Each structure stands twice: as structure tokens, then as C-alpha cells.
């Protein structure tokens, strides 16, 4: 064993003591902690609700997330129902350690885990970039993380046991921005750095464009100009956009 992955229920002080013990015993062990992303309401994510209700196992990566839905209280004897002040009684906010990442680094955590399953390329690109900057000691801003999918942010168990205010009160994302699909790349001209795009939804100059593909990853840039000096690209047209390297078949979005 070279690395241990610590439970998400551990506090900062408990992690500190574990690392002290490892060093004291001269154990050749690395420590990994979860620092960003969705938090399962069950202890260490060992939830069977999706399996029980829909025969889709969370422990096999197939969770339908029934915890994210609204619930009511119903009297079994006479059927009376009560709506709660916040009906999302099992939907926890996302963990975000950016504000105190330096503390985890200081106590000696070796590796950080960021949620990536079922997330799009832009989410992965934005979140990993911000945390990479933080690890390298560069200035970061929580607002950057608020741009992509999130359910609101919590410090989890790092400083205390989460209370009722650590649960969300709506379904879906609180992201400040959203991607809008606008077309596909049909060609890329490397010599001039222009992507030819088949337009499915209108977009215009000075909007931020995101192009995603299996090989291209996530490419985000400001539309500075179209190849033919137009101002707007309309549905059904094929237009050229000045772009970093992308590939045929990549999906094209603008950020709203």
C-alpha cells in the first residue's frame, strides 16, 4: 500500500493527527483527500437508495440521485402530508476546499481528489485549473468555480459536522453561466487558425466560445472576429471563426 484515501467525514484536525502518526511510525504512506464536488448524504457514499428504488447501484457508478429530489412527510395511518421548509432534505451542497486548501497542504496531504464522473470537459478544465493555481500559490477567486456546475458550496466535515444550512433548497445547478450548443466543427484550417462551423443556433462576435472534443479537450476563447468579417453567425450557415487547434466533429457552444 502506497497511499490511503481518507473518508470524507474526517475533520482537518483528525487528518492532521493521522499524518502525524504516519510520520511518527515512519510509514511510507501518502494521504489523499477529497476537496471538491458532489457530496453524498450517506456515510462515505455507501448509499443504497438508488438501488432499492430503481435497481441502479450507486456503488457501481450508476446512481439516479433520488437524494436530489424534493420530499414530503406523510402520516402512514391517515395519509396526512406535511411539506417542509426545505423539501430537499437529502441534497447536500458541493464540497469546496479552495478557501482553505493551504491548510491541507500545510498539514501534509499529498494528493487531492476532485469529482469528475459525469462532468463535461469545461467543468473539468475550469475546476482543475483553479485548484492547480491554488496549489502553485497563485491568486484564485471562488467566483471562477461558481461559473460551472455546482449546488452551492460547503466546507463539508473539515471544520464541523454539517448542519441544515449545508443542504440545497432547489434542484439542479447554481452555476452563474451556462453553455448553449450552437453547432459543430466541420473543418479546421491549421495554417490560418480558423475553425469552420456548421451553425445550429445563432451566435455573435465578442461572445465566449467553448469547443469540446475527445482529442481537443476543452478550448475556450473570445470570438474576436469571423473569417469573413461578419458580426453574427446565423442558423444554417457555415462560418469561419478564429480559433485555437480543434478538430472536425467537435461540439461548439457559447457561454451565456
What is each PLM-predicted segment?
Residues 1-256:
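Surface-exposed amphipathic alpha-helical tracts and adjacent flexible/coil segments at the periphery
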Amino acid at each position: 500500500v502506497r497511499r490511503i484515501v481518507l473518508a470524507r467525514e474526517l475533520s482537518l484536525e483528525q487528518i492532521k493527527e493521522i499524518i502525524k502518526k504516519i510520520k511518527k511510525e515512519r510509514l511510507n504512506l501518502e494521504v489523499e483527500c477529497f476537496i471538491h464536488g458532489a457530496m453524498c448524504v450517506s456515510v462515505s457514499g455507501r448509499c443504497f437508495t438508488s438501488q432499492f428504488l430503481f435497481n441502479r447501484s450507486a456503488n457501481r457508478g450508476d446512481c439516479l440521485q433520488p437524494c436530489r429530489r424534493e420530499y414530503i412527510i406523510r402520516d402512514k395511518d391517515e395519509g396526512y402530508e406535511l411539506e417542509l421548509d426545505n423539501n430537499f432534505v437529502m441534497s447536500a451542497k458541493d464540497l469546496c476546499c479552495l478557501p482553505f486548501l493551504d491548510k491541507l497542504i500545510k498539514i501534509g496531504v499529498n494528493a487531492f481528489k476532485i469529482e469528475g464522473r459525469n462532468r463535461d470537459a469545461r467543468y473539468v478544465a475550469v475546476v482543475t485549473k483553479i485548484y492547480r493555481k491554488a496549489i502553485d500559490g497563485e491568486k484564485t477567486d471562488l467566483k471562477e468555480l461558481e461559473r460551472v456546475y455546482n449546488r452551492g458550496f460547503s466546507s463539508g466535515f473539515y471544520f464541523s459536522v454539517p448542519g441544515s444550512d449545508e443542504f440545497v433548497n432547489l434542484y439542479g445547478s447554481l452555476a452563474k453561466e451556462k453553455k448553449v450548443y450552437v453547432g459543430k466543427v466541420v473543418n479546421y484550417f491549421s495554417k490560418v487558425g480558423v475553425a469552420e462551423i456548421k451553425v445550429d443556433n445563432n451566435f455573435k462576435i465578442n461572445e465566449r466560445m467553448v469547443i469540446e472534443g475527445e482529442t481537443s479537450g476543452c478550448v475556450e476563447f473570445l470570438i474576436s472576429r469571423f473569417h469573413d468579417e461578419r458580426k453574427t453567425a446565423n442558423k444554417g450557415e457555415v462560418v469561419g471563426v478564429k480559433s485555437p487547434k480543434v478538430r472536425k466533429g467537435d461540439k461548439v457552444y457559447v457561454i451565456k
